[in-house]
Amino acid sequence: MFFNIFLPGAIGGDLMRIYGSYIEYKLNLKTATSFVFTERILGLVGVCLIFLIGYFLSGKSFKFFNLSESCLMLSAVMAVSLLICIITYIKIKSIITYELLLVLLVLSMLGQFGDIIIVKIFSNYFNLAITITQLMVIMPLVYIATILPISFGGLGIREGVMATLLLLLGISPSISVVISLLLYFTKIIMALVGWMVYIKTPNKGLRELQMIKKKV
């Protein structure tokens, strides 16, 4: 998370996870990259599942999408089918078991729920009538926008997308931007804690990253 804040999109964190797998677990770069790619794909699948579940449970809150129930059902079936295909493909191409893939998917969804809970807490502070199910629709869209390599740490993109979506629920853009910035500052604090753990972990350092570059 620390590296994601200072690099475009999610590239920084992914590169450092590949680096950590290469150094600590002695994996070759191809295997390490495939593991990180698998986790990223499962994360996106988890985000899509959260979005679909939230959309179904939020009732008429998001009529602006203008999607019929039959269209939503078809989307859900396609999403589940795609999930099965992705998991099967990953299982064939890697040594990851189905049980581990399921665990990774669940952990990815729980991680996304962290942002949802944080935004809900800040919304309650401002006395905003936003439900968890509504945030299950909004936050996945915000997440997908921020992982695009457009700005550093998704700064500006996160605020714009969140303000636009919350405006559709009648929330003032100024309050939406404040909540988004509070979420960003929360991520910075968590990232700094992660960085402290990272630099105190044996056999990890930026000098080793230079060694990898020389070998590649």
Regions from the language model: what does each represent?
Residues G13-D14, K26-I41, I171-L182:
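Membrane-interface alpha-helices at helix entry/exit sites of multi-pass transporters
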Residues Y19, K120-N124, A163-T164:
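Transmembrane alpha-helix boundary and packing residues in multipass membrane permease domains
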Residues M16-G20, K30-V36, G46, F152:
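Hydrophobic alpha-helical membrane segments of integral membrane proteins
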Residues V47-C48, G54-I150, I157, I171-L181, ...:
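Predominantly cytoplasmic-facing regulatory/coupling regions of multi-pass membrane proteins
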Residues I18-E24, L166-L168:
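Helix-loop junctions at the membrane interface of multi-pass solute transporters
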Residues F37, V161-T164:
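Short amphipathic alpha-helical face segments that pack within enzyme cores
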Residues M1, I5-I11, R40-L52:
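Mid-bilayer segments of alpha-helical transmembrane spans in multi-pass integral membrane proteins
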Residues G9-I18, I147-M162:
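Transmembrane helix boundary and interhelical junction motifs in multipass membrane proteins
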